[in-house]
Curated annotation (Swiss-Prot):
HAMAP family in the cross-refs: CemA_PxcA
Alphabetical UniProt keywords: Cell inner membrane, Cell membrane, Hydrogen ion transport, Ion transport, Membrane, Transmembrane, Transmembrane helix, Transport
Descriptive protein name: Proton extrusion protein PxcA
Location of region: Disordered: 146-167, 186-205
Pfam families in UniProt: CemA
Physiological role: Required for H(+) efflux immediately after light irradiation to form a rapid H(+) concentration gradient across the thylakoid membranes. Together with PxcL, contributes to transient H(+) uptake following dark to light transition.
Length: 467
């Protein structure tokens, strides 16, 4: 009998284990090869359709549908290359001398270090072009490094004429920004900030012509510039992409945790819980509040039966009949609160899955978070001072205002019922006495530190409205 078992193991199970071990040992080579293939695919798109240059989404050679097709392929290949490079690094980190010896015994030959280095170098050369792709989704096309260098390198022969030209460049970019308010990568933000500082310094000085005439000249030059329309179109496309990415990410961070909670509760937590629970020894009430609610409901039911028995024209019920109805109601309440207790326990584990899904979504969506931040910056800073002050007052009054303790109390009691915990009044009152105060301090510090520097007029409007 043992010999038969050994023969079955050697004939069926051992080859499966050996092939799985070979697959594990080949993980570094396989990951690097897949990343290399993804880089080759990107390079092929560049060579065939962009003359060997970087894939430019603002190119006017192809239509929007074609560029969307290239963008989808590029995103997929970049994702594959980066994931496989990460897998390669981790598998190399776990690889040691014993694994290499086992690979040689299994007949596995790793590629030479020169081949590996050449592939890694090629992958880095291809991927490095798209490191700031997420910035470029929201980057304006109206400002380029060459324009900044040309503007800063020209000597100011005529102060007024120089002011007019610089004012024209700034107004051209500001016109597009006022229409679609695109954002910029850090390098362009720094360059444009330095350029605007120089322009403001020149504008503050007294020139031959008034500044209003210079701004009029700049506006006319913008209207007559043949590239102005293309700049507006490009910035509209970038703003549209930014809005789509931001709204999609907002929907994801709302829908994914809720969907994870419902699916994990129905498909994972409930079957496991129902398998291990014992209906005979299962606790009916998780806390004293549930018990008090059940007893109060049963007492009201008993009083209602007696009251209806006294005022009805039908023959009075006997004590046994009343006791039977009360017993049926008690069993109904026991089943109801047993289900509520089980549901509360399931909610705890389902919420853990939801939090895990939320954290995972944040970790894998860092580019989307950056785009979302830029989107909110443009929306908030595009509001008027009165609107900013109104929103600040609304949020502060809701969360830290005079009536906010009632809202916090409802939220905490709802969370307690959701998890089957008793509503601890001492903890609730302590939370209400401390957390809104901390939140109010953070609000005031943010207003004093950041908003006062970014928009002093909004702070002044906020103070006037608050008074």
């Amino acid at each position: 009998m043992p010999t038969m078992r050994n023969s079955i193991f050697s004939e069926k199970i051992y080859p499966i284990l050996l092939s799985a071990y070979r697959w594990y040992l080949r993980t570094p080579e396989r990951s690097l090869e897949e990343a290399y293939k993804a880089a080759l695919n990107i390079k092929a798109i560049e060579d065939e359709h962009f003359n060997g240059n970087k894939i430019d989404f603002n190119s006017a050679i192809y239509s929007n549908s074609v560029m969307d097709y290239f963008e989808s392929d590029l995103a997929q290949e970049l994702k594959t290359a980066r994931m496989r490079l990460t897998e390669f690094r981790f598998s190399r980190w776990f690889s040691n001398e014993s694994h290499q010896k086992a690979a040689r015994k299994a007949g596995i030959e790793y590629p030479s270090s020169n081949v590996t280095l050449e592939k890694l170098k090629f992958i880095d050369e291809v991927i490095s072009k798209y490191i700031i792709t997420d910035y470029e989704i929201v980057a304006p096309s109206g400002v380029s490094e060459s324009q900044v260098r040309t503007t800063s390198s020209q000597p100011p022969e005529n102060p007024s004429l120089t002011d007019a030209l610089r004012t024209n460049d700034i107004n051209k970019n500001n016109l597009v920004e006022r229409i679609y308010t695109p954002t910029s990568p850090p390098q362009l933000i720094k360059q444009r900030t330095e350029q605007s500082k120089k322009s403001r310094g020149k504008a503050d000085t007294t020139g031959i012509l008034p500044r209003s005439i210079l701004s009029t000249i700049g506006r006319l030059q913008i209207e007559l510039d043949p590239n102005a329309e293309q700049d507006v179109i490009n910035n509209f496309r970038q703003a549209q992409k930014r809005s789509i990415i931001s709204i999609r990410f907002i929907l994801l961070i709302i829908i994914v945790p809720l969907l994870t909670h419902q699916l994990s509760k129905a498909l994972i937590v409930s079957p496991i819980f129902n398998h291990f629970k014992n209906d005979h020894t299962e606790q009916i009430f998780l806390n004293s509040e549930m018990e008090e609610e059940a007893l109060s409901t049963l007492h009201r039911f008993e009083e209602r039966i007696k009251f209806e028995n006294l005022i009805s024209n039908a023959p009075p019920l006997s004590a046994e009949a009343i006791e039977t109805q009360i017993k049926e109601k008690a069993e109904e309440l026991a089943a109801e609160f047993r289900g509520e207790s089980s549901n509360a326990i399931k909610n705890v584990f389902a919420d853990i899955f939801s939090v895990g899904a939320f954290i995972w979504l944040l970790l894998v969506s860092k580019p989307s978070i950056m785009v979302l931040k830029e989107f909110f910056d443009n929306v908030v800073y595009g509001l008027s001072d009165s609107a900013k002050a109104f929103i600040i007052i609304l949020f502060t009054d809701v969360f830290v205002g005079f009536h906010s303790p009632h809202g916090w109390e409802v939220i905490l009691e709802g969370l307690s019922r959701h998890w089957g915990l008793p509503a601890n009044r001492d903890f609730i009152f302590l939370f209400i006495a401390t957390f809104p105060v901390i939140l109010d301090t953070i609000f005031k510090y943010w207003i004093f530190r950041y908003l006062n520097r970014i928009s002093p007029s909004a702070v002044a409007t906020y103070r006037n409205m608050n008074e």
